[in-house]
């Protein structure tokens, strides 16, 4: 039996054991007169990191825990155990039941509705075995770093390169009679190097990630791209304070959309801590703008057959023609808002932002003409309650659709409400490595504070 086949057989055997553990825990809680939900996630993996062509770290992981929530009427108790023996599971259930007796009643607590459960969960092909040993992982990390160090003489140091390989089992069950599980895999290779001269150093990184090992970009691609990004940042200039159009590069643009996701999530809404309160069915983005959620795309990083409450995930239009179609609610926040769960316990699943411009970043730069291309943001200056947005940024100054020079040490500021409404275009240079898949986004105007 090949190593990959062997590890798959072991994982499948482990899956059956974990299913039995979950069933046992649910059964114990039910016998005690409670309703319950139980989740187990077990992850095993290998991480190898290297720096300056020497191995720094080899790490094997094998982590897992069973978490149980019990509901006695309107009272809830939680407990967890990493020991999955029958006696340990019994102790965890008893602990959760004991805690429930002392918690305040909450009429919104409890399992998600039975008719929302994923009793027939689709196989999304999230598990792909690969024969990766320490030697292979080391070779990939070293190759990526070497490619970066050799790409340009201005690259003078390294933060290192690392390869990660992880496989996992997720099992979820509850007293509605739901019991589902799936296997998953994830592989990634990353590199970060430093360029420039003393007192004027810049660093950047590049990575590739996939559920399938053979779909990763090559180590050469990772290393050379990493070096290219660093070199392009060398000798940045500062800008004077001004108000100009701004392009958020695709992997930074995902952040803008994630702030939007936070603002329409049930937790923010029922606490009245969102700048998009009472905006369901209203225009929040330009009329050409649409976001679809597709949780069942095969082999994708953010695909999932059910959320962390066992609710089946399904295709949804989040925004259509700029109009907000849905909030993102769990069973708890849904009850608080008088709505049904949308299957978003645990986050969002494959958001696809529809581009309205072909030709990638080049076409978007041309459309902007003169302005700022943001390639990096830093700091915590985002307030979901008020929509205030103010973050440190770096990127490139653009004139006549052409990049002129790198810029750094600037602050960009605006209101998220305005930033969303003032989007002019989304390019088709889609970032596929995130749960939000969007191209670069052009905004009408933002305030830039510099010198």
Swiss-Prot record:
A biological process term (GO) from this entry: proteolysis
SUPFAM superfamilies in UniProt: Putative modulator of DNA gyrase, PmbA/TldD (SSF111283)
One Gene Ontology term of the molecular function aspect: metallopeptidase activity
Keywords (A to Z) from UniProt: Cytoplasm, Hydrolase, Metalloprotease, Protease
Coiled-coil positions: none
Main location as per UniProt: cytoplasm
Enzyme Commission (EC) number: 3.4.-.-
Signal peptide: none
GO cellular component, one term: cytosol
Pfam families with a match to the protein in the record: PmbA_TldD_1st (PF01523), PmbA_TldD_2nd (PF19290), PmbA_TldD_3rd (PF19289)
Keyword Transmembrane: no
Subcellular location: Cytoplasm
Homology family: Belongs to the peptidase U62 family.
Primary role: Probable metalloprotease.
The name this protein goes by in its record: Metalloprotease PmbA homolog
Originating organism: Haemophilus influenzae (strain ATCC 51907 / DSM 11121 / KW20 / Rd)
């Amino acid at each position: 039996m090949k190593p990959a086949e062997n590890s798959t057989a072991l994982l499948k055997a482990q899956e059956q054991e974990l299913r039995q553990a979950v069933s046992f825990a649910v059964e114990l809680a039910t016998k005690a007169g409670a309703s319950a939900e139980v989740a187990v996630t077990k992850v095993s993996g290998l991480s190898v990191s290297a720096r300056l062509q020497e191995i720094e770290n080899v790490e094997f992981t094998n982590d897992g825990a069973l978490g149980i929530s019990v509901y006695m009427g309107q009272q809830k108790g939680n407990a967890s155990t990493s020991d999955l023996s029958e006696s340990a599971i019994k102790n965890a259930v008893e602990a959760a039941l004991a805690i429930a007796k002392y918690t305040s009643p909450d009429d919104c607590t409890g399992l998600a509705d039975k008719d929302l459960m994923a009793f027939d969960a689709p196989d999304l092909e999230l598990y792909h075995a690969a024969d990766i040993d320490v030697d292979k992982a080391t070779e990939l990390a070293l190759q990526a770093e070497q490619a970066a160090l050799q790409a340009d003489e201005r690259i003078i140091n390294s933060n290192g390169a690392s390869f990660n390989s992880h496989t996992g089992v997720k099992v979820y069950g509850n007293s509605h009679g739901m019991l589902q599980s799936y296997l998953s895999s994830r592989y990634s290779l990353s590199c970060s190097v430093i360029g420039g001269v003393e007192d004027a150093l810049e660093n950047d990184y590049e990575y590739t990630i996939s559920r399938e090992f053979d779909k990763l970009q090559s180590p050469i691609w990772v290393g050379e791209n990493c070096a290219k990004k660093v070199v392009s940042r060398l000798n940045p200039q500062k800008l004077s304070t001004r108000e100009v159009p701004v392009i958020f590069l695709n992997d930074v643009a995902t952040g803008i959309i994630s702030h939007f996701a936070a603002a329409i999530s049930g937790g923010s809404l029922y606490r009245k801590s969102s700048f998009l309160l009472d905006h369901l069915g209203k225009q929040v983005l330009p009329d050409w703008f649409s976001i679809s959620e597709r949780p069942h795309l095969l082999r994708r990083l953010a695909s999932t057959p059910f959320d962390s409450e066992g609710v089946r995930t399904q295709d949804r239009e989040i925004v259509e023609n700029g109009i907000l179609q849905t909030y993102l609610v769990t069973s708890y926040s849904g009850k608080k808002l008088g709505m049904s769960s949308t299957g978003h316990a645990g986050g969002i699943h494959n958001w696809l932002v529809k581009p309205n411009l072909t030709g990638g970043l080049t076409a978007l730069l041309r459309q902007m003409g003169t302005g700022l291309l943001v390639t990096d943001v830093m700091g915590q200056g985002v307030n979901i309650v008020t929509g205030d947005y103010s973050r440190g940024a770096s990127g490139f100054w653009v004139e006549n659709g052409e990049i002129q020079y790198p810029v750094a040490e600037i602050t960009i500021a605006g209101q998220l409400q305005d930033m969303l409404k003032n989007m002019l275009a989304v390019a088709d240079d889609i970032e596929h490595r995130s749960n939000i898949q969007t191209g670069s986004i052009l905004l009408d105007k933002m305030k830039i504070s510099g010198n």
